[in-house]
C-alpha cells in the first residue's frame, strides 16, 4: 500500500465574518487563490498531473453551491482535465477531504491530490436554509441540533465551570496573538487580498479575528449565549465567526520523491466515529482513541495536538478524558485555536492540520494528532508522522 505524504499546507488569514477583511471577497476566490498559491509554491508538480481536488464546504448554497471545488478550480485555471469534488462532513469536511484523497492514494487510484476547504460565514450563514426533518424529534432531542446547548450539556456532565471556560478562552487569544507577533504563522498564511475598515484594498497576512486585549476579567462580564438562565457558555468562550480557506498538497511518497519534492509528514492513521448528538462535542475522544489504535500509538506518543475549539466547554472535557489536562500548555493548541481564530466550518480541518504540521516542525516532534468534533454527533481525527 502506498504511503501518503503531505508535501505542503497553507491557509488564508482568518477574516472576521461581520464586516471583516473578506466582506467583498467570495468563497470561490479564497479557494482559487490557495489552489494557485499551492501550485506556485511547488512548481515541480504540474497542475495537469493532479488526479483530483477534494474541497470541504458545509453550506453548499449561494456562492458556495453547485460544487464549489470545481468552480474554484476553474477560477484558478487548473486544467479542465483535473476533476474536483466538494466534500461535506459538517465541521470535519476538509479533514474528510484529506481522508478521501489519502485513501485514493493508498489504493493506487491517485498519486497527487489537492485538498482543502472553505467557508465564508459572512456571506453564507451557518443556519441559512437549514430545515431539519420534524421526525428527528422522535429519537433526537431538538437541542442536539443547537451546538451551544450541546456544549452546555458537556460542561454540566464534566464539571467544567464558567471560570475554567473563561481561562481557556483567554489562553486561546493570548497564544494566537503571541504566535502572530513571533511570525509563527508566517509559513502557513498566504497573503490574501481584502478590504480594510475604510474599504481600501490591501493584502492581509494576519488573522484579524484575534482579540489580543482579551482577559479573563472581561470574559467574566459576558452573559450566557445559549442558556440565559442556567448557562455558562458565552460568545467569548465559543469559536469566533470567521471567513477563510486552507489547502494541502497530498501525494504518494513515491511520486513526491520522483519529482524531488520533500514531504513534510506522512498520514499515519485516520478515524471517524459517531457519538450521541446531544454531546456532539465529545467526538474527538473516541475518534482520537481509534486513530491512535490504528497507528499503534498511545496518547503519550503524540508530541503536539491540534483540537478544534468549538467551545471551551466542549474541548476541556475532551482534553480531560484523553488524560491531557496537566499537559495543556506543553501539547494542546500551542498557537491558540478556533476561539481566537474562528471556525470557518469547511476550512477548519485543513486549517488545524496545517497549523499542526508547522508546530511539529517547530517543536521537532515525531507525531502529531489533529481532531475535531462534528455537529449532530461525530468525531474525526488524523495522526501525522514527520518524515
UniProtKB/Swiss-Prot annotation:
Which keywords has UniProt assigned to this entry?
A: Acyltransferase, Cytoplasm, Fatty acid metabolism, Lipid degradation, Lipid metabolism, Transferase
Q: Using the UniProt record, give the first listed, main subcellular location.
A: cytoplasm
- Its catalytic activity? an acyl-CoA + acetyl-CoA = a 3-oxoacyl-CoA + CoA
Query: SUPFAM superfamilies, alphabetically?
Result: Thiolase-like
- Pathway connected to this protein: Lipid metabolism; fatty acid beta-oxidation
Quaternary state and interactors: Heterotetramer of two alpha chains (FadB) and two beta chains (FadA).
As for what it does, the entry says:
Catalyzes the final step of fatty acid oxidation in which acetyl-CoA is released and the CoA ester of a fatty acid two carbons shorter is formed.
Name of the molecule in the record: 3-ketoacyl-CoA thiolase
Q: Provide the species name.
A: Shigella dysenteriae serotype 1 (strain Sd197)
